[in-house]
Amino acid sequence: MDRLAQDYSLEITYKSYYLRPDIPPEGIVRPLKDGEKVGDSLTGHIGEVAAEAGLTMRRAPLTPNTRMAFEASEFAKVKGLFEQFHRACYRALWEDGVDLGQLSVLLHLGEQVGLDAQEMKNILDTGHYESQAKEQYDEALSMGVTGIPSFIIGGYFFSGAQSYETFKKVVEMVKNPLQLL
């Protein structure tokens, strides 16, 4: 997404989507496929697209409850540190297999990117951004989002891990609608 934004001078707006609201606060153990181990690189389409984008995605041991992470992300947005916090959360989950449902993890990641841990803790303890995260989730549902990642570019909705070339085609289509004829 960074490359696309730079190549086309796009503004990207990230929104929270609570993929699995049924996950308990302690998370759930991720089932492994035959021969798979925690920490293995993801394979298939997701692994290929991640590798193409220069991202590492490893099999995490746990599917975390991400409610607090979404609220922490809203806090990071207000402080102008969303992208840094988002990247730190991505690395923690997909590279290091860390549980993003743990307050201590989120506070540590926040501190790493320059957020005040005590202020973040107070925000998370009070549920200050809970309604905003819920509104974003409801908005996504109303748009037909059922999974992540999902994208809306110029009114076109698509979901799933996509290559840079796919994004590029969509942006070109939106920029030059007459090419569709």
What are these regions (language model features)?
Residues 30-52:
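Short, structured active-site "lid" loops
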Residues 68-72:
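Conserved N-terminal beta-strand and adjoining loop/helix that marks the start
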Residues 64-67, 97:
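Aromatic- and histidine-enriched alpha-helix N-cap/loop-to-helix transition segments
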Residues 16-27:
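Short, charge-patterned binding micro-sites
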Residues 56:
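Conserved active-site segments centered on acidic
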